[in-house]
Amino acid sequence: MSRATVGRAGAGAGHGPSGGRSAAPTGDGGRRGGATGTDATPGARRIRAAFDAAAEEGRAALIPYLVAGYPDARTSLAVALAAADAGADLLEVGLPYSDPLADGATLQRASSAALRAGATLDRSVELIEAIAAARPGIPLVPMAYANQLIGGGDGRAAARRLADAGASGVIVADLTPDEGGPFEAAARDAGIAVVYLVAPTTAPARRAAIAARTGGFLYCVSLVGVTGARRSLPRAVGRYVAEVRAVSSVPVGVGFGVSRPEHVRVLRRAGADGVIVASALVDALGPDGRDVAALGRLVGLLRVATGA
């Protein structure tokens, strides 16, 4: 297993019922609304509402990913608004980082370019605030790494900053539930969800335990490895998604390698409640990262596929 999958897979799980599924076992003491987990926060409820609205329309939720500050601050805001207007149900906003261990070549390149263009944590939070102000109906879920948000502390300041900017939740790619208790407490106090991840290599019992701790939705990594556009998804992805759904009581969003409308259709038929598309959208922006219209067209095609 790659170190990227280790970081993301150990992180967390959860899955939301798309119409009356019974709650999954909580495992590991992860009581819903109790002393652990963040699924009872206002942010988690906003995330769940977006998944529920998509399910009521008979489709999966579409979650485009963008890199904050790529290729520059103004264009990344235009990218976010274009994705929202083309059919996004939620937006995942990657906070540029110098060592993005879960990211493949495309997202690493975009993150590096954003940093060279002046992206910082403060400016990324300002972007989230601008998106939230312009499109208040779309839940925003930043993705970051533990060193960015927590460092040597408990992350209270970062959680509050993200909440104040309008984020509904946060994905910390290399944070596991075993280590996430203090940051969960900070997120609960701030009112946002901590979204954890599972991978194909995560043991079934651990998937259930992670699912009990995630907030809003469970990030289901579709493959072993890092992010990046793929021609096809793993053959066993349908069975894997079904297995994760069976142990999760919050929505399951599937990402990594999801690149084409046909991938979205495969995952929807497998039972995914949402699909996350990242590298393919960055690629659509072209070599200079500025073809916002092309990105909007791809998001539109992906949105159609969520109900096919």
How does the language model describe each region?
Residues 74-82, 202-212, 254, 258-275:
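Catalytic cores of alpha/beta
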Residues 1-3, 27, 37, 242-253, ...:
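Alpha/beta catalytic cores of nucleotide-metabolism and tRNA/nucleoside-modifying enzymes
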Residues 104-140, 185-199, 233-252, 260, ...:
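Alpha-helix-loop-beta-strand connector modules within alpha/beta enzyme cores
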Residues 62-66, 91-93, 140-144, 170-172, ...:
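Hydrophobic faces of well-ordered beta-strands that scaffold small-molecule active sites
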Residues 197, 207-242, 246, 284-289:
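Glycine/Thr-rich beta-alpha phosphate-binding loop at enzyme active sites
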Residues 1-10, 15, 21, 25, ...:
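N-terminal amphipathic alpha-helix/helix-capping segment at the start of soluble metabolic enzymes
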Residues 116-119, 167-179, 193-202, 207-208, ...:
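Catalytic beta/alpha-barrel core
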Residues 89-100, 169-171, 176-179, 220-228, ...:
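Glycine-rich phosphate-binding active-site loops on the catalytic face of alpha/beta enzymes
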